[in-house]
Design a protein with these regions (language model features):
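Alpha-helical transmembrane segments of multi-pass membrane proteins predominantly involved
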Residues: 1-171
Length: 171
């Protein structure tokens, strides 16, 4: 919160050794995430109160929202992966929070497809790190702009894995 308030004073904030960057882009999407989360809380209030685990529902919803907000602020591959997986784990549990066979089946299927997507995404990140030697998005961009011709295919392959993993996660 301090970093967001500090940025609103007109400066860009960088924290955690450059892993997190607060700027106008991340502030805008963090606000969108907060508004969406509040809308979900208001829309599901009566339904969530009927659950045995209503406290867990709200805790998981807030965990997913916080990790999505961190994702908008991430500036390296490790932070991106941790934020995506934290969001995913919260969503896996939210899918299976209702105690019935359909909820358990849906949660397990979502977990398995999410694990495959995470593996594909991480494989792309490994290729990207392997060819560039860095995890910072700024440094990766600088490397990609000046990469020798023999690295272009590996960069393209890593991009394909990353897009496939992210696309699979979003689907």
């Amino acid at each position: 919160i301090w970093l967001i308030v500090h940025h609103m004073a007109g400066t860009e904030s960088i924290a955690l050794g450059g892993s997190v960057r607060i700027d106008a882009f991340s502030n805008f999407f963090s606000i969108v995430i907060v508004v969406a989360t509040l809308s979900i809380v208001l829309a599901t209030r009566t339904w969530a109160d009927t659950l045995e685990r209503s406290i867990e529902f709200y805790a998981l919803l807030l965990t997913a929202a916080a990790s999505m907000s961190i994702l908008t602020q991430a500036s390296d591959l490790i932070t991106i992966f941790i934020a995506i997986e934290t969001t995913s784990i919260s969503q896996f549990i939210l899918v299976a929070i209702v105690k019935d066979d359909k909820g358990a089946e849906a949660g397990l299927k979502y977990l398995l497809t999410g694990a495959v997507a995470a593996a594909v995404l991480l494989y792309g990140f490994v290729f990207l790190f392997g060819v560039s030697g860095v995890v910072s998005l700024d440094q990766i961009l600088n490397f990609a702009e000046s990469a020798p011709e023999e690295y272009r295919l590996v960069l393209l392959l890593s991009l394909m894995f990353i897009v496939a993993g992210l696309g699979y996660k979003m689907a």
